[in-house]
Regions:
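Long, positively charged, glycine-interspersed low-complexity recognition regions
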Residues: 257-258, 267-336
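Conserved SAM-binding loop of SAM-dependent methyltransferases across substrates and taxa
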Residues: 81-97
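Conserved proline-anchored active-site loop of SAM-dependent methyltransferases
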Residues: 61, 72-86, 103-108, 114, ...
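A mid-sequence, solvent-exposed acidic-amphipathic segment
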Residues: 218-246, 250-251
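S-adenosyl-L-methionine
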Residues: 35-73, 81-82
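Class I S-adenosyl-L-methionine-dependent methyltransferase module
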Residues: 92-228
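C-terminal recognition-helix end and immediately following basic linker
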Residues: 1-36
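Mobile active-site "lid"/loop adjacent to the S-adenosyl-L-methionine
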Residues: 196-210, 256-277
Length: 336
């Protein structure tokens, strides 16, 4: 039962205490409205947390993208910050894409989420609301990281998270419900990380004081309309890049070359190793009569491989650093 609703973000609460905490949090909720979406230079924000997401530097990237494109290709979709910004500008007639828009990712579950937002937004939202309401109603503090029943799961929010994580790893992966769980886990796990091991998704609970917003109905409807013509493809970069033709534009945001041994570099069980970076760089150099833009970390392997190309340094905030999440790093964008 929903008794309280935030007027700004439309998030719903069944308990007055959680509703009050939400209203009084230090960082107020700022949610896109229909009027915001009509403004010039409005960029739709991503609905997922994602390691290496480009929201904070989107303006540095978007100015390097051509205003007239044959086919648009995004080879490492992830959280979709750049794709959503490009589509926002296309909607404002500031970028012209003559033919098709392709978005690729090696994570098939992520691709399914985007596809379900395209075609099944109502049912997706119902599932999200169902699980978020159940989570929000839990008040206990007894932690069970291996619950075997819904009663054990409801002993605490943390227990419920692990119950959902197990369900996510064991259920049919092509369903709308699985995509809803993907989105739920993304906002309740540790800092939005996506990481898989031999037994599936394995990121721990995020310990958030306030029940997070998964996605508002306004944003879901707007994004569904925005991405309606995008072709989402589950594919590795080596296969995706073969689809690029003369006159096309390619944006690449691969797992970054590690700055050190502790850097987070991949979200699938296979990771993204040094040989894959070298193979990617080799394939990029084969792009002739094709415009491209790549984001990466500013390390020797990147700068040495792309000496002949244009580049620009960007200061960005680190997304995952448990000791100092507010620290910054230097990234680089490479383009031709």
């Amino acid at each position: 039962m929903v008794n309280f609703c935030c007027e700004k973000c439309k998030k719903e609460f069944s308990q007055k205490g959680n509703y009050t905490k939400h209203l009084n949090k230090k960082i107020p909720c700022v949610v896109s409205t229909n009027e915001d979406m009509k403004k010039d230079n409005y960029f739709q924000k991503p609905f997922l947390k994602w390691v290496g997401g480009k929201t904070q530097i989107i303006k540095d990237i978007i100015v390097k993208i051509p205003t007239e494109i044959n086919n648009y290709h995004e080879l490492f979709l992830g959280g979709g910050s750049v794709l959503l910004a490009v589509l926002s500008l296309q909607k404002q007639n500031k970028i012209v894409i003559k033919n098709k828009i392709y978005a690729y990712d090696i994570n098939s579950f992520l691709i399914n989420v985007y596809k379900h937002i395209q075609t099944d937004k109502e049912e997706l939202y119902e599932y999200i609301n169902l699980y978020l309401t159940e989570y929000d109603n839990i008040k206990g503090s007894i932690i069970n990281r291996c619950p075997t029943s819904i009663d054990e799961a409801k002993t605490s929010k943390e227990s419920y998270y692990y119950w959902i994580r197990t369900k996510y790893n064991t259920m049919d992966k092509n369903t709308i419900e699985h995509s809803a769980l993907f989105m739920f886990i993304n906002k309740t796990c540790f800092r939005g990380m996506y990481r898989e091991g031999p037994n599936g998704y394995n990121v721990p609970y995020g310990h958030y004081k306030i029940t997070p917003t998964i996605i508002s109905k306004t944003d879901l409807n707007y994004i569904s309309d925005l991405i309606k013509d995008v072709e989402f493809i589950h594919s590795s970069f080596i296969n995706s890049i073969k689809n690029v033709k003369e006159g096309d534009f390619v944006y690449l945001d691969p797992p970054y070359v590690p700055e050190n041994d502790n850097s987070f570099v991949g979200y699938t069980v296979d990771g993204f190793n040094l040989e894959m970076h070298k193979l990617l760089f080799s394939e990029i150099k084969k792009l002739t009569k094709i415009k491209f833009l790549m984001s990466n970390s500013k390390v020797n392997l990147v700068t040495e491989n792309f000496k002949e190309y244009y580049s620009e340094d960007i200061i960005a905030r680190r997304a995952i650093n448990s000791k100092n999440p507010g620290s910054t790093t230097t990234e680089i964008i490479i383009y031709n």
